[in-house]
């Protein structure tokens, strides 16, 4: 039987599990084929690329840190992020006694054609926001949020835009598509 691999654009507020919890929608309402499970997690307040598959060995491979699968994020942060802060992110940050691995990070322009988040992030006219693109090869709980906060720029909106060689592209929130297992 052929392995099924799905790329899903997880909307804000949706859990990365099939069992709903009070106040949060889960994956069970998006019409996925039977037998698929999330290969990783994305917090309910984060958006973007989430892989699902029916192959347990593939899930294990995607989650095992020794394989260092890159994951790329766009983070909208509070304030105008500085190059020094980005350089700190690149070198790694100490969070609760753990030193993160070096990552790729760069300041980027606000993304064009980005869907609106529902609900929108807070808006304060006198405090700007900025965007940073980060590629990590590890995935600790809320790592990007902890990293940006540690350098003085808390994350307001977080979107995973790529997992390994699989970009989210123009896939809209709540939509999914089958991807080729060999590109992982």
Region spans (language model):
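RNA pseudouridine synthases
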Residues: 1-184
């Amino acid at each position: 039987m052929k392995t099924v691999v799905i790329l899903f654009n997880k909307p804000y507020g949706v859990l990365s599990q099939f069992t709903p919890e009070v106040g949060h929608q889960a994956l069970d309402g998006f019409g996925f084929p039977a037998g698929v499970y999330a290969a990783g997690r994305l917090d309910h307040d984060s958006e973007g690329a989430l892989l699902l598959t029916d192959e347990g060995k593939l899930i294990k491979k995607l989650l095992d840190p020794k394989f260092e699968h890159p994951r790329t994020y766009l983070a909208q942060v509070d304030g105008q992020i500085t190059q020094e802060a980005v350089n700190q992110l690149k070198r790694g940050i100490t969070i609760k006694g753990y030193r993160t691995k070096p990552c790729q990070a760069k300041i980027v322009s606000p993304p064009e054609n980005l869907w609106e988040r529902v609900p929108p992030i807070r808006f304060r006219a006198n405090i700007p926001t900025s965007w940073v693109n980060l590629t990590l090869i590890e995935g600790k709980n809320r790592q990007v949020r902890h990293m940006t906060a540690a350098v003085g720029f808390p994350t307001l909106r977080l979107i995973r835009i790529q997992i390994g060689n699989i970009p989210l592209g123009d896939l809209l929130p709540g939509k999914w598509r089958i991807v080729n297992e060999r590109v992982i």
